[in-house]
């Protein structure tokens, strides 16, 4: 905890020095003490009745902050308070309470939310329906709750979150919702059909490929890739000429999925257009075309030769994509080209070679993976191990050897696999479990805990050993690991030990300063080799996240790091010092889930699980409603949006600076 306190103070210091003193006037904050205590409770993940009762006596703004805080504290005592705030005189408070109840995931809140769904304030009703979707309510019960409202009002409250109800009955509702004249409601109806599609929605999805809204065309194409058939390829083909990149990218992915799934053959009439898209000036389109082209590589000499040439002559990111595409398509030159890439000087390309080798399978790919397993880069070793374990279900000895790797990420991957596969007893794995969790690299530790719990379910003879390990993990160690171990014990029907506060090292004075520094939005520039992206940081909605981001930026933490994840028409992600999605600053911060939405240009905190954020952030390239209420939104791109579409995998972040 001392280390975390020092880290926080350093971050505050970095924020203070990133601008002159005159740039940071003291902000007068009403009810500063109460707001600071609420932030302290969120950070400690604890409920305090005295603080709650004091906040309830405050004005509407303070009561709204209370509702937000209670939604971020996993304590059922907060549910009763929030249900009372659902009938507050102020609409802003009722909205915050409705959203917060959805975040608490307590099914007993459903009764109060059904009533709130028909609140006089539409937004409160929308948020109540969203919360009911998160809590697993039946859509028929939501409809019954909305019956007293006019029909247009019912649609306005139901459609934005209809996709959250995982029932086949939503298909008919969404199809009716498509008739709404409000373009946004029409789009949300289409999203509900597309996000987790049911096969019976196929006829409607096919029609939506010609919708006037490019978002709808893209969503429909994606859905057809999941539930469509080979008969859908002719309907997808026109989207290769779509004027918007979203539908084009999703049609390429859908075709690749249908072919890879054995539902279709690679159509010859796509070849010429696909070949042209391999040289498209838009990086996202080009990347998607390269990925899809693997499905044509073996049957089309033109496509196969183009991909083979790209592995040698393209930019590094293109070479890696082409290499994996050739391996996935079983092209005859793939093994030779993968072996060459395995000896490349570029770490990212060697990691891609490991992925390709895994797709080649054994024994050909195994020879390449054997060499990469001893690579100097932990990133390459981790990729080689993951590929090897995926290709060979009998790779127990490989995993055991990896437990001795000096890198925690490699050890974590091995431990996760060994815990899931009964080739080693849990008693044998216990020493490795103790050392797998490292702050800032929590994904491996969380995966190991879940794998141990899964072993308890699948191997009755080891249930006792698994429970003992989980009890040990729940009793000590980092908060997120203790919480996960306790949750897994509960699922196994075992007593869940009391959860000690997450953060004990910071006093109220630290939180007062954070509240004062984050009472207003701040602005930063993310300077990249492709141009500058200007982001307004929504500090009032996510103060801990914003102060952390500003502190890291002020220290120069982001200087020279890369965008290690680029998914066209979805997100770009950066901020990992390891460059592979497993790294962080050496600590984690609390989630601050809020009501800001993941439209294009939203900036969110990347996670490996609840409360595991640190330095990695992502920016959405298109609207992503399914991310709403699941990841902290802490910023919005306000200038330089065109740069987002030019970012390539591996592009560098030159610097992140705060600007006026």
List PLM regions with ranges.
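Cyclophilin-like peptidyl-prolyl cis-trans isomerases
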Residues: 15-17, 407, 424-427, 431-660
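HEAT/HEAT-like alpha-solenoid repeats
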Residues: 50-58, 83-87, 111-118, 141-148, ...
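Bacterial Sec-dependent signal peptides at the C-terminal "C-region" and cleavage site
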Residues: 14-30
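Sec-dependent signal peptide recognition
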Residues: 2-9
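Glycine-/small-residue-rich active-site loops that bind phosphorylated ligands and cofactors
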Residues: 105, 120, 150, 541
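Structural detector for internal amphipathic alpha-helices that build alpha-solenoid repeat scaffolds
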Residues: 25-46, 53, 61-76, 81-84, ...
């Amino acid at each position: 905890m001392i280390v975390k306190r020092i880290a926080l103070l350093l971050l505050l210091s970095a924020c203070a020095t990133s601008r002159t003193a005159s740039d940071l006037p003291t902000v007068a904050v009403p009810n500063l003490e109460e707001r600071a205590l609420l932030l302290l409770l969120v950070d400690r993940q604890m409920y305090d009745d005295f603080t709650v009762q004091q906040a309830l006596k405050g004005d509407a703004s303070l009561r709204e902050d209370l509702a937000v805080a209670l939604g971020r504290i996993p304590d059922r005592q907060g549910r009763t308070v929030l249900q009372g705030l659902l009938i507050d005189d102020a609409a802003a408070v009722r909205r915050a309470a409705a959203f917060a109840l959805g975040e608490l995931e307590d099914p007993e809140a459903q009764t109060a939310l059904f009533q709130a769904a028909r609140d006089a304030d539409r937004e409160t009703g929308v948020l109540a329906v969203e919360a009911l979707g998160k809590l697993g309510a039946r859509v028929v019960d939501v409809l019954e709750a909305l019956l007293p409202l006019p029909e247009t009002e019912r649609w306005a409250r139901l459609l934005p979150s209809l996709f959250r109800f995982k029932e086949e009955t939503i298909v008919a509702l969404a199809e009716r919702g498509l008739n709404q004249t409000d373009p946004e409601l029409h789009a949300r109806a289409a999203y509900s059909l597309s996000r987790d599609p049911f096969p019976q929605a196929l006829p409607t999805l096919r029609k939506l490929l010609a919708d006037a809204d490019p978002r709808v065309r893209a969503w429909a194409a994606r859905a057809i890739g999941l539930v469509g058939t080979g008969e859908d390829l002719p309907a997808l083909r026109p989207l290769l000429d779509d004027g918007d990149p979203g539908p084009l990218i999703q049609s390429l992915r859908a075709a690749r999925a249908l072919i890879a799934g054995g539902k279709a053959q690679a159509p010859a009439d796509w070849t010429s257009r696909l070949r042209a898209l391999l040289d498209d000036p838009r990086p996202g389109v080009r990347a998607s075309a390269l990925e899809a082209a693997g499905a044509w590589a073996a049957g089309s000499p033109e496509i196969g030769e183009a991909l083979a040439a790209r592995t040698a002559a393209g930019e590094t990111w293109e070479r890696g994509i082409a290499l994996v595409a050739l391996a996935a398509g079983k092209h005859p030159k793939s093994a030779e080209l993968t072996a060459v890439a395995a000896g490349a000087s570029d770490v990212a390309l060697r990691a891609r070679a490991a992925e390709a080798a895994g797709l080649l399978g054994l024994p050909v790919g195994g020879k390449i993976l054997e060499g990469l397993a001893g690579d100097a880069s932990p990133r390459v070793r981790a990729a080689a191990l993951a590929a090897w374990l995926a290709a060979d279900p009998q790779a127990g000895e490989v995993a055991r050897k990896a437990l001795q790797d000096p890198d925690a990420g490699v050890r974590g991957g091995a431990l996760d696999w060994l815990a899931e596969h009964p080739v080693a007893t849990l008693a044998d794995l216990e020493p490795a479990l103790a050392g797998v969790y490292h702050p800032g690299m929590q994904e491996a530790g969380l995966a190991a805990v879940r794998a141990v719990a899964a072993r308890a379910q699948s191997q009755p003879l080891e249930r006792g050993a698994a429970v003992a390990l989980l009890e040990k993990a729940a009793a000590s160690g980092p908060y997120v690991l203790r919480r996960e171990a306790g949750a897994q014990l509960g699922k196994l029907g075992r007593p869940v030990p009391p959860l000690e506060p997450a953060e004990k090292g910071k006093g109220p004075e630290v939180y007062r300063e954070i509240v004062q520094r984050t009472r207003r939005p701040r602005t930063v520039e993310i300077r990249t080799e492709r141009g500058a992206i200007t982001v307004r940081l929504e500090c009032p909605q996510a103060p801990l996240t914003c102060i952390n981001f500003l502190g890291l930026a002020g220290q120069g933490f982001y200087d020279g790091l890369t965008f290690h994840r680029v998914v066209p028409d979805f997100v770009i992600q950066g901020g990992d010092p390891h460059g592979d999605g497993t790294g962080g600053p050496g600590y984690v911060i609390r989630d601050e889930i809020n009501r800001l939405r993941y439209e294009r240009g939203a900036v969110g905190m990347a996670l490996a699980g609840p409360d595991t954020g640190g330095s990695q952030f992502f920016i959405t390239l298109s609207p992503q409603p399914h991310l709403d209420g699941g990841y902290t939104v802490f910023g919005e791109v306000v200038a330089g949006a065109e740069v987002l579409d030019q970012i390539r995998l591996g592009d560098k972040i030159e610097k992140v600076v705060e600007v006026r």
